[in-house]
Structure formats: structure tokens, C-alpha cells
Amino acid sequence: KRQGSYNMIVAMSKVLEKAGGFQTVNVNPDSPGGMGAPYLFASGNTDLAFINGAPAKWAMEEGTLGKPATSGYAAVIGGLTAVCYINCVSNAFLQKYNVSTIEEIFEQKLPLRIGCSAKGSMDAEGAYLLLEYFGVTEDDLKSWGGSITNQGGDANADAIADGQIDFYIDHTSSASSTMAQIATSVDVTFLQWGDDLCSWFVSEKGFDLITIPANSFKGQDKELTLPGTPDCVFCKESLSEDVVYAITKSLSENRDALVAEYNSLSPWEPETAWEEMKRGGCPLHPGAEKYYKEAGYMK
């Protein structure tokens, strides 16, 4: 999954070299995960990075992953992807306990075995945020007979098929291959979360609400609206206005070619890429603002 982001960044760097007049753009393949990415700028070696909007804001305000708050970065392009907390639970679990919602599962203290990615990823953060919302610790969950297992997508798909986990959550899009694989191999229900839970993610955590069309996955016959926070391009705050203007302009003007290469970028609309919700409420770099105003997208 991070591989996908890496490939998109390489494609963007080629645009900057060809169309943006930048000599060489080096891409570092190391990714600290969505929650750690804001800290890349503190080292001084990073000029541009892909970060989800909400954790970029959390890192500025209170810090993430137990680290102190950080700064030194600003938004360039928001809303590149339409990703959200797609989640599914095995029908065997729902039938066994006669429940149909995530709220009932937590309120009844059921032994839910959760599968998600590595700690520090935006994917796993969804599981920990659910616990936070319901006022439950990981020890509480264990005392009910539940658990959180951190592992890769394929391992989670195998685990839910083998009955080792009951619930899988990922910060992903309607094009998720892991969700598609699970839906075709196991009887699962894709859960729509209640209004209170979704609103908490928006008002307390800076998420947006993203709609996943009906029938994106086998057995998912209703559309889902779930909290998510889009991938964004952030830059080092100290980059000059001219440089960031040139970056924003060349990427925005080559949006169609990039989307043709990477369909997951199709939600990116330069006309709205500056909007606050699209960038997690983080400050916009003045160079990016200059481009959006000049293009007539921003007043």
C-alpha cells in the first residue's frame, strides 16, 4: 500500500523535472507511516511529502506516536485521494451475538478480534480511535476476549477467512484489493457507523466524510459514508514562495496525466485542492495560495 504512494510520488517528481523546470527530484522510499510522516520535515532533508491531512494537524497540535508536537511544514495540495475507514465484520460473528452495528459490539463488550496494519499507520489508527471513542482500553478489549492484531493486508485477509479475527479495518478506497479479496472469500458485512461516531471523527479528530459507492465490494449493497482523511502533498515551510508556486502549478496543470497513470488520484480536483477540509485544517503554503488565487480557484 505504501508502495502505491511511492509510485505516485515518483510520477509527480517526473512531472516536476519535465514540466516544472526542477533539475533533479530525489525520492526517498523510506516511509515512517501516515502517523510518523509529519516528522520527516524536522530532519531538514525533506522538501515534499505525502501525508494524510488529519495526522499532519495532530502532529502540529499535540504530537503523534508519543512524540512532542512538530512544525515546519505547510500544505501544497489537498484531497488527492478518497480514502476512509472501510471496515467489515464476519457474518458468523454478527449471527453468533445477534448484533448488526459497531456500536452494539462495543456497548455489549463483545469479544471482537480486530485485525489491522502496523501501529503507526493510518489504518491501525482507526482501530485505536474506535477504542478511544467508546472509552475502552486495549486491556478492556482483551478482558472481554477480544484483541487487536497488527499485520499486513494479506495476513488479515487470511486471518478473517480462517476465523482468527472477526473484524478488519483499513484506511483505504473503494479500489482496495484486500477488501475485495475478503468480500469474495468470506461472508462479511461492511459496517456503516452511526452519526454520532462519524461526527466525532469529524469534529474531534479533523476527518472528512467520504462516500464509498454501493457495490464497490461483493455483498456491499448500500453506499457507505465513513470518516477518512485524504492524502495531501505537504512541503517544507521554509521553501520560497516561487518554488512552491512552481510545484503547485506544474502538478496541478498535469493532474489529468497523473490521474490517467494512477486512478486512485482521481478525487484530486485542483479547483478544490486548497480547501481547509481537504488539507486537514493545516496552513496552506503562500506559494500554493498564490497559484490557487491566480488560477481563480481561491478568492
Residue spans of the language-model regions?
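Bilobed "Venus flytrap"/periplasmic-binding protein-like clamshell domains
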Residues: 1-30, 85-162, 274, 278-287
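Extracytoplasmic/secreted proteins, especially bacterial periplasmic and envelope-associated proteins
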Residues: 4-11, 15, 36, 40, ...
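An extracytoplasmic/periplasmic, membrane-proximal ligand-sensing/linker region
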Residues: 8, 162, 167, 172-184, ...
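Active-site catalytic pocket residues across diverse enzymes, especially alpha/beta-hydrolases
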Residues: 16, 20, 45, 63-64, ...
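Loop/turn elements at helix/coil->beta-strand transitions in domains of secreted/extracellular proteins
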Residues: 21-23, 45-48, 71-74, 109-113, ...
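N-terminal segment of the mature folded domain
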Residues: 33-84
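Pocket-lining segment of extracytoplasmic ligand-binding domains
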Residues: 53-55, 61-64, 71-77, 92-94, ...
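Ligand-binding clefts/hinges and TM-proximal coupling segments of bilobed small-molecule sensing domains
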Residues: 100-129, 208-272, 276
